[in-house]
Amino acid sequence: MSKPIIFLLTAFVVLTDLGATEDTEKVEVKAKPSKTSRGAIGQGFELHKIDLLSKELQGTGAQVFEELPVEECTTDNKLGTIQKDDTFYSNTESLYNSVASNSKIEPSLKGPFTLGTSVGAVTNNIVSEKSEIQGLSLNLKAYSMIHALKQDCINKKPLAKDLVSDFEALDREVKKPWLKPSWRKYKVFLEKFGTHIVRETMSGSSIYQYVFAKSSESFKQRDFKIKACLSLGGPTQVGKLGISACSDVSKKDVEESSGKEMVKKLVVRGGKSDTRVDLTGELSKNQINKFLKEATTDPSPIQYTFYPVWTILKARYIGKEHYAKATNLEQFYKGYLNFDCAYEKSEKGLELQKFELAEDSDPDAPTYVCKLGPEGCHSDDDCESDDLIYCACCGDSCIRYNNTVLLSTGDTKKVAFINDVDDEFRDHGCGRKGLKCKCKEENKKWGQSWSGDSDADAALRDINAMMLDQNRRDQAKRHHVKKGKSLH
């Protein structure tokens, strides 16, 4: 049996608008690592359906491994640190960056599909791709321990029997991949076992006070800080919370803040459940400090990092016939779901967007692209006279591209639409034929807005091809020897 290939996750740093870090206090952690402090480590969850910011993941995730012996497969390190700081989110992208960075989710997944549930939970769903938001969080954190799943166990420990049987039963070739029903089995697999496992848990106790508003309100960073401090402690306790960010809030600040409407969200995690119940409304310094100190004796998870299920499967099945299914799973999630390459047609039945195999896709390690219908005219009816010289593409089958800026990522997404309004979209296949404008040079070349190919994927495909070729030769040799023995 070939040795499993070990995949290393590349650490990435995403910049957020951090406020001044306050005093860090060292404390002695008396608690010992436990099932409670480790939480849902090693379990599978659908990342796009869970709230990573305001809810604690219950230990009821999917079973991905047959077993993960604690002593053999986890590392437990005590931290013993209380830290108080604040984070300013200057725009929508910085908020998404923060969530992705803290959860160690790859940058390509930091958009609204994968992280929208989490971001919506603390912003009261005022986030959209059409309007920017700004905000701030007061972060009061007591870190007790960090628990991590060892990479060797991720790569070698037996996978759950039903996961293996369900995975190997998936279609190797997905026919008509642009149609959502074609991916039904893959969708069911992700729903059952999750898109990611919990790789690490940070235990302790934490209090986060979030405040947000649409950027159009033109609030300053200090406005958000004052509102967060008032939301946490109220007008009478705001300067007595033991938080330096709130120490200079004046009576005038309190009065002016009352007229500034913002979305507020208090998130309390970790510590004792009985104490958490009491931490509602306006808090006092004693309440805050008591709860943070509970991290030393009664820690529970306050932060999680994740690892993709398809990365686990690619490591297990590289060089085998089922490897194609692992890449299918990854590309379905990243391209069809997360990038939103759903099948789109115009009212006249013209294909605008289509999820399809790349032209040079390897059947043993498929890669997909998000294709856009050929830009320009597709009928003489699309072409009309712009003036005495030029023709313009404007009609029911005139396809035009537009680059849309995604506020959640800062990236641009190329989209195709029917241009039946702008009669100054000159040329694009339209030209003069006598006195009339005709579709003289119809474009047949499809555009592309997303590709599942990367340098890392190319390297893995090469390794998979070499190992698969060797395995097939070995299998043919064994078959030949067996056949020879049967003849004698």
From Swiss-Prot:
Provide the MACPF domain boundaries. 24-344
Q: Which GO terms describe its biological process?
A: killing of cells of another organism
In alphabetical order, the GO MF annotations are: toxin activity
Which pairs of positions does the record mark as disulfide bonds?
370-383, 377-391, 393-398
Identification of the protein by name: DELTA-alicitoxin-Pse2b
Role according to the record: Causes lethal toxicity to the shrimp Palaemon paucidence, and hemolytic activity toward sheep red blood cells.
Q: What is its main location?
A: secreted
Residue spans making up a coiled coil are: none
Q: For the EGF-like domain, which residue ranges apply? A: 369-398
Keywords, A to Z?
Cytolysis, Disulfide bond, Hemolysis, Nematocyst, Secreted, Signal, Toxin
Q: Which interval of the chain is the signal sequence?
A: 1-21
| Gene Ontology annotations for the cellular component aspect, listed alphabetically | extracellular region; nematocyst
The domain of life for this entry's organism is Eukaryota
Q: Name one Pfam family in it.
A: MACPF
Q: Which InterPro entries match?
A: MACPF
Q: Where in the cell is it found?
A: Secreted; Nematocyst
